Amino acid sequence: GGKARSVKVQESIQLLKKIKNEYETLYQNISEMSLNTNDEFIIVLVDQPTKIRLGRTNIWAKLLVLREFEKTILGQKRLSDYAYLDMRYNNQVIAKERL
């Protein structure tokens, strides 16, 4: 195929590669990755589908926070137990549980 010209598309491809190599459980559960009108990354999980809002900057750092959050809830809940996870704020997860 042709070479992706958009910086954000290239950034998305690099991010997906890094997730595949370093956070495989998340990679296996990604249904889609998109950018909203504010150029914020959004990941939708296969399960349920949970929406994860990552924002525009420090995406990998936010994914590391998400991975720690996932480890914390392991055995009690899964990421898919939440309707959405908002990672736009540094070092915190804003979570809305499914009803």
Question: What would you call each of these model-derived segments?
Answer:
Residues 1-99:
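Charged, solvent-exposed interaction patches on well-folded alpha/beta domains
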